[in-house]
Amino acid sequence: MAPQKHGGSSAPSGKPSAAASLLPVRKPKMEQIQADHELFLQAFEKPTQIYRFLRTRNLIAPIFLHRTLTYMSHRNSRSNAKRKTFKVNDLLLKVEKMKGDQESHSVSAHLQLTFTGFFHKIDKPSQNSENEQSSVTLEVLLVKVCHKKRKDVSCPIRQVPTGKKQVPLNPELNPAKPSTFPSLAVSSNEFEPSNSHMVKSYSLLFRVTRQGRRDFNGLTNGETNENIDVSEEPPARRKRNSSNRDEGDKTFVAQMTVFDKNRRLQLLDGEYEVAMQEMEDCPVNKKRATWETILDGKRLPPFETFSQGPTLQFTLRWTNDTPDKSTAPIAKPLATRNSESLPQEHKPSSVKPAQTVAVKESLSSDLQARKERDVSSEPRQKLRIFYQFLYNNNTRQQTEARDDLHCPWCTLNCRKLYSLLKHLKLCHSRFIFNYVYHPKGARIDVSINECYDGSYAGNPQDIHRQPGFAFSRNGPVKRTPITHILVCRPKRTKASMSEFLESEDGEVEQQRTYSSGHNRLYFHSDTCLPLRPQEMDVDSEDEKDPEWLREKTITQIEEFSDVNEGEKEVMKMWNLHVMKHGFIADNQMNHGCMLFVDNYGPQIIQKNLCRNFMLHLVSMHDFNLISITTIDKAVSRLREIQQKVERDECLAPPSDEAFEEPNRTTSSSSSFMETNGKDRVVENDCVSGQPPKHSKKQKP
């Protein structure tokens, strides 16, 4: 009743109440839209991050090559025409030729250095133009680090001077001829491997000396009277200090490796800028002068070092007698490695000698011509493609139209629309891609594949390995044995765009994964460690008898001193027999004895060990391991084997050995057939170590 009374009030008071009642109704709609948008972003974010990671991983350690796929055959630019004439011996000849060319290039080539200038912009310019210094003295030394001998504390170093040049100081970067710059050549004889066992590495040592300039007051450039200490130094000490080093001179040094200890060339053709380091003011002992690099403790950023100096710029070339060709590859800056396809007028201009530019153009012309030929031979398919992302059957986002055929997730250039759609469907199966025709190109609808099996289908061994194992793989590795069940493999149909159209409602099962890998992981029962793929065929609980264990057992039995030789032989055969078949229970001994007679019966008869074997059976009976029935069966079986051996010997043709030696088998058999009344005597003889007595009766 109260709401009705409140509703009968005046009209002006009713409108604000209606507006107040509508505001809470709009807020849930905006929150729901934002929540749906967040769910949309989360649904597409996880697969996108996964495919971005897989892209980086495939670049480092690819699982397969895209050019080998059927729908990417246009990416394979190689022809198999040379396979018909291919021979394995050609590989060795090719490698030897390449190795010989590299050695000849590295040794026979002369090292030519052309110095552009020495740049040092920290000092303030002098007011007197007459005393302005325009050059510095550069000394180039070839440092040879030799192998250390036993008596040497450190590796001996040999310094070979190659020459001195006057290098311009802070020259203006204007185009100039190469002849205007000082150049220096290092002969190839210095790098000859005549004493290669002595020299370990070769380095170039640059030593720049900048002489001090003095004005009319006798002060060096950049100094004033304020810099002089109040307490003047005595003339004698000042004279003594000036004798060690010229006052005002500055020395800058730098070192670069030419050949390392493995005789690999480290300096290629190109333009270099080396950061120099100033040596501290310290007295040098002329009797034992050695070159040292002493840091001043001031760490400058790299850009500040090369912008202010001191730096030395030079051009390095490996040349032969012909000055127009180079024998070593060119070390180009990083910024120009991918700029070969740009026109010449669009390339940034820089101060380079004409010879260096000619060499770079000659080396890169073949590669550039081949790239242009490959690109021009294939007509480019210009299509405007845009992607439309769907979530809950509603369009959430649409990308801008692109005129290329690159995959948005792995940036692979598919070059054809059919190849792009096939790649998206097979390599990015976490999404569903539907092709929609467009007059100017194509539209691809992207939605989440709800039927995708996101369980781990890779190698289960990788889960238990350390992080980063996938990137540290060096070559092929053995994987778990796998069996794929092919549900259906029909005849390959002709490529058609209709297979990428939107599927019907009854074809949802086609998005499901039909076959999966062997993702089971087994563990050792004794150590609980994962079973590796190479251990799948071997049972860890199976007690085998390796060769080393058999030899160890025989050696230990030979060391026994309280048994005779016959007992040792029976013990060896019995222990190896038990190890091979793995008898571990008492109820297995009856079967083990019969199996032992079948396997080792001929050896027992041949070595005349029948009585020793009888004692072994009696000993096992004393420990309740076998029964009397087993002893009777074993003895009967042994007699059958003995009679068979005798029959074979009678049928065999007589030999010289048969006349020289008596029939041992007959003697042993007659002795074995003695009555049980003599068993005690036999036992006493065997224990005492005496050989068994043979019967004098011989069979006719």
UniProtKB/Swiss-Prot annotation:
Cellular location(s): Nucleus
Keyword vocabulary terms for this entry: Chromatin regulator, Metal-binding, Nucleus, Repressor, Transcription, Transcription regulation, Zinc, Zinc-finger
Recorded GO CC terms: ESC/E(Z) complex
Statement: the UniProt record of this protein carries the keyword Zinc: yes
GO molecular function: zinc ion binding
GO BP terms in the entry: chromatin organization
InterPro entries per the UniProt record, alphabetical: Polycomb_protein_VEFS-Box
Region (Disordered): 215-250, 319-376, 651-700
Keyword Glycosyltransferase attributed: no
Main location, first listed in the record: nucleus
Superkingdom, natural source: Eukaryota
Stretches annotated zinc finger (C2H2-type): 405-428
Region (VEFS-box) residue spans: 520-596
Ranges of Polar residues composition bias in the record: 218-228, 664-674
Pfam families for this protein: VEFS-Box (PF09733), Zn_SUZ12 (PF23320)
Quaternary organization: Component of the prc2/eed-ezh2 complex.
Family: Belongs to the VEFS (VRN2-EMF2-FIS2-SU(Z)12) family.
Chain's role: Polycomb group (PcG) protein. Component of the prc2/eed-ezh2 complex, which methylates 'Lys-9' (H3K9me) and 'Lys-27' (H3K27me) of histone H3, leading to transcriptional repression of the affected target gene.
Official protein name in the record: Polycomb protein suz12
Native organism: Xenopus tropicalis
